[in-house]
Regions:
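Conserved beta-loop-beta/alpha segment of the NTase-like Rossmann-fold superfamily
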Residues: 63-141
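Structural signal for interior beta-strand "rungs" in well-ordered beta-sheet cores
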Residues: 209-318, 322
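Short internal beta-strands
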Residues: 53-59, 135-138, 286
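N-terminal glycine-rich phosphate-binding loop and ensuing alpha1 helix
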Residues: 1-80, 364
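Conserved beta strand-loop-helix elements of the APE1-like EEP
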Residues: 143-156
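Extended, small-residue-rich solenoid/repeat segments and analogous flexible loops
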Residues: 155, 159-250
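C-terminal segments of enzyme domains that contribute to small-molecule binding surfaces
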Residues: 288-392
């Protein structure tokens, strides 16, 4: 049976105060969760059930977002762009194209929600009841924007897309999803999806190697030997955790991100290509693209100071050029320091030698004698004696 899928991203016009399904101006479905974007995970799940031909229609042009240009999609996924007002018309036209190409069933899903559904079971439910359109619902019977449409149901498909997935032309028995569901409407939902993946509550497996129980590292991730990582935690591919940094309480650091020296990151998601500055405390938030969303206060702010929240170059060539420039700036300083340091050490030794004409610092001859004898017996003449443990 020829089964195809249409995935939709966007297509909503939220009112003031309603969730936008975006972080900054980027759809949550396009952001990484434990090393792989939500849309990639959905496409991967469809392929697992034999649905390998997908059309992805989004109302966010990749040309306007450099981050979106860097994402990788399956070669069998056909990406399309439509303006927000034209997205539903584009979806209807894509359904017609799928039917003309021989599709017998079409799965329609708006991201929106991340749903772990058994597509084989849902399709069998649809066929057994000879439905034209079958909609999925969660365990509380709340509707999900997930449908299976028969190729013959062209009028039903037109009604569905024209109503923005809000109305069915003919009633049918819904299919209840027993798996994991995340509505993915705000940054807090994105954070919960990542944390649930770390705790194995869903099928979002971290992309990388579990080096210790609950601690995952992606390929080429670098953690300084003086940094601390407390499980559960994830550090994505190419990311850097610098000296004295602390990663704890389910923190997720996505690919090519940097956590600078001495920064504490607790119960936080650091999004890809983000540089978190030195000496900061990032707690209970989502950080990235020069923005911070505090989960407890439900507030999202833009940060203009790159020393606090910066952006790593997206292009590998740009990252290599930056690293090379930093190396060439570092080497002359080290070479100069290597030549100058021996001379400075010799000067320090000469200055530390006692002068024959200098008067004693202590007036008591007995104390002077005992002190000088003990110093001579334990240490060379160019060492200064200090108390090791304070005043005790």
């Amino acid at each position: 049976m020829d089964i195809r899928a249409i995935l939709l991203i966007g297509g909503i016009s939220p009112k003031d105060g309603e969730p936008t399904e975006r972080f900054g101006n980027i759809p949550l479905a396009c952001l990484d969760v434990l090393g792989m974007s939500v849309e990639e995970r959905v496409v991967q799940r469809l392929a697992h059930f034999g649905i390998t031909i997908c059309s992805l229609i989004a109302d966010s042009p990749a040309e306007g977002q450099p981050f979106l240009r860097c994402r990788s999609l399956d070669s069998r996924t056909r990406p399309l762009h439509a303006e927000s007002e034209q997205l539903w018309q584009a979806a209807e036209q894509e359904f017609q194209r799928c039917v003309e190409d021989g599709a017998e069933l079409v799965v329609v899903l708006r991201l929106g929600a991340y749903v772990e559904v058994d597509y084989e079971e849902m399709i069998q439910h649809h066929l057994d009841r000879r439905s034209c359109v079958t909609q999925a619902v969660d365990v509380n019977s709340s509707p999900l924007e997930l449908f299976v449409l028969s190729a013959s149901a062209r009028m039903d498909a037109a009604e569905l897309f024209q109503s923005r997935l809000g109305h069915l032309r003919r009633e049918s028995e819904p299919f209840q999803v027993k798996g994991y569901v995340n509505r993915l409407q705000s940054a807090s939902d994105l954070r919960r999806l990542a944390l649930d993946g770390l705790l194995a509550r869903n099928a979002a497996v971290p992309q990388g190697k579990e080096v210790k129980p609950g601690i995952w590292l992606g390929p080429s991730a670098r953690v300084h030997r003086k940094a601390r990582i407390v499980a559960p935690a994830y550090v994505g591919a190419g990311s850097k955790i610098r000296a004295s940094a602390l990663i704890t309480r389910g923190t997720v650091v996505e690919q090519h991100a940097v956590v600078d020296c001495g920064t504490v990151v607790e119960n936080t998601t650091v999004l890809p290509f983000t540089c978190l500055g030195a000496g900061l405390d990032a707690m209970h938030c989502v950080v990235g693209f020069r923005r911070v969303a505090h989960l407890a206060r439900n507030v999202e702010v833009e940060v203009h100071d790159e020393k606090l929240v910066g952006t790593i170059p997206l292009s590998p060539v740009s990252r290599l050029a930056g690293s090379t420039a930093a190396l060439f700036a570092f080497l002359p300083k080290e070479i100069y320091r290597g030549f100058v340091s021996p001379w400075r050490r010799k000067q320090a030794v000469r200055n530390a030698e006692p002068s024959e004409e200098a008067e004693p610092s202590l007036e008591s001859p007995g104390l002077e004698a005992s002190a000088s004898e003990s110093e001579t017996s334990e240490f060379p003449s160019n060492f200064a004696v200090v108390r090791r443990y304070g005043n005790h």
